[in-house]
């Protein structure tokens, strides 16, 4: 718990600087993308793969600097790659569920190499494009609310579901136990209620981005997406026999362990902005 607090206190000033300075935002997101390409290697030493993705990322930033209209494509690519990767994620879990052992060591015997390859690459594209979609959501300082709303809501969801779930959660969902064995029913309920209430209140009283009717719809979809994003990442880690994506953030694990719910909700907000534009 204390590690989580210390990590949050360290990250908060970086986020503030990122939204004060465009250059720092660029460097901050570039650093996150580099860490994502490393973490999605998933224990494999594939440095050529990292260099390839870094080249793609730098090309995207170059196009942005040359004023090419590529902002919106990050949202579409993230949605498409996310949808495709779900198929490989579920396929891997179904085919190898007998090899998943959470009490001792997770076995990788009998894994489908082709399926794991496509799962790793499609999920990496989703993560990277999801992070880069922030450039579409946040194009000027006046649009800071578009970023603060999902970030604050996800923070509330993670905090309350973790506290309530760890203190009062006993009953687990057998359907999801193979993916996330430590999550409880009360934790999921808390996540949904927290996301619904916090999103609607923040939008209505502070940010005023969406109309009340639109906010109601997104308030329902938001916590569902946040929880699904967490389960999605957990499924990938189970497929590769990992507990965490990394250990760079004490108390959280890797960068993706902290951003799993954030990225999918950024895509949701990006889609909402597309349809409302």
Question: Where do the protein language model's features map onto the residues?
Answer:
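Membrane-embedded alpha-helical bundles of polytopic integral membrane proteins
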Residues: 1-220
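Acidic (Asp/Glu-rich) catalytic motifs at the cytosolic membrane interface
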Residues: 34-45, 154-172, 224-265
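A short, terminal or domain-edge coil/loop segment
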Residues: 81-87, 232-236, 266-270
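Juxtamembrane boundary at the C-terminal end of a transmembrane helix
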Residues: 270-277
């Amino acid at each position: 718990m204390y590690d989580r607090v210390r990590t949050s206190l360290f990250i908060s000033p970086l986020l503030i600087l990122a939204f004060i300075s465009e250059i720092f935002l660029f460097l901050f997101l570039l650093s996150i993308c580099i860490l994502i390409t490393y973490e999605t290697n998933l224990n494999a030493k594939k440095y050529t793969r990292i260099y390839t993705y870094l080249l793609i990322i730098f090309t995207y930033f170059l196009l942005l600097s040359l004023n090419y209209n590529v902002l919106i494509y990050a949202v579409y690519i993230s949605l498409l790659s996310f949808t495709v990767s779900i198929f490989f994620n579920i396929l891997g879990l179904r085919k190898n569920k007998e090899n998943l052992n959470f009490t001792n060591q997770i076995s990788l015997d009998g894994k489908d190499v082709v399926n794991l390859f496509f799962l790793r690459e499609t999920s990496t594209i989703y993560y990277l494009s999801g992070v880069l979609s922030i450039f579409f959501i946040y194009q000027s300082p006046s649009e800071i609310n578009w970023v603060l709303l999902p970030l604050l809501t996800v923070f509330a969801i993670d905090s309350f579901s973790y506290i309530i779930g760890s203190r009062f959660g006993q009953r687990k969902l057998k359907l999801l136990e193979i993916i996330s064995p430590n999550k409880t029913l009360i934790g999921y309920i808390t996540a949904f209620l927290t996301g619904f209430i916090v999103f609607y209140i923040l939008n209505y009283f502070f940010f005023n981005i969406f109309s009340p009717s639109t906010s109601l719809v997104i308030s329902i979809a938001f916590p569902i997406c946040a929880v699904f994003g967490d389960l999605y990442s957990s499924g990938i880690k189970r497929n590769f026999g990992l507990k965490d994506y990394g250990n760079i953030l004490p108390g959280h694990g890797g960068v993706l362990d902290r951003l799993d719910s954030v990225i999918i909700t950024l895509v949701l907000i990006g889609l909402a902005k597309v349809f409302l534009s």
